[in-house]
């Protein structure tokens, strides 16, 4: 479990199925869980503060980790320990899908089919960052980014068109399957 409070940014040393990340942590253990841009991964190999993680097909399909390039930044958070404070919300690291950034800056607007399961003022994890949903509309949602979030996380540098990992808060998401009616669907249908 995680909180969505990013501890630091890491740098991709080697992309791919055996993802290598410079974490800045020298005290990680083999088998430890780390959220990498919101995705719960298990430490497979350590060399100083460089860590390797194995990515399976489902991870590559559901997340943006397969699109990472050498030198890219990722958000990092270590797993909760008993007695830690819960400053964000409970995050499993089980990304449900991705969204596309359509507006960035002090607010972030993301298009995704998962919006149908969201509620305003509910929590969401975007690339591992715990955020409060400001607004929900068909096929999209908006969150506000405070200065510390823009400074510490990758969201302060995210560009329009980028894919971001999304995990809905299990306590506030709406039940049911997301609607397949998106802006693109409506546009193609002539609306």
What is the meaning of each model-derived region?
Residues 1-191:
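Conserved loop->alpha-helix
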């Amino acid at each position: 479990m995680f909180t969505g409070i990013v501890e630091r940014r890491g740098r991709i040393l080697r992309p791919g199925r055996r993802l290598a990340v410079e974490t800045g942590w020298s005290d990680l253990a083999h088998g430890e869980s780390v959220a990498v841009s919101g995705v719960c991964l298990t430490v497979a190999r350590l060399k100083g503060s460089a860590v390797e993680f194995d990515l399976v097909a489902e991870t590559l399909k559901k997340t943006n980790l397969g699109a990472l390039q050498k030198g890219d930044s990722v958000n990092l958070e270590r797993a909760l320990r008993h007695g830690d404070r819960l400053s964000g919300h409970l995050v499993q690291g089980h990304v449900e899908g991705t969204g596309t950034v359509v507006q960035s800056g002090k607010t972030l607007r993301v298009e995704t089919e998962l919006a149908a399961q969201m509620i305003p003022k509910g929590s969401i994890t975007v690339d591992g960052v715990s955020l409060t949903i400001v607004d929900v509309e068909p096929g999209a949602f908006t969150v506000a980014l405070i200065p510390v979030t823009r400074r510490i996380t990758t969201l302060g540098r995210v560009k329009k068109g980028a894919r971001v990992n999304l995990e809905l808060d299990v306590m506030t998401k709406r039940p049911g399957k997301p609607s397949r009616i998106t802006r693109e669907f409506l546009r193609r249908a002539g609306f």
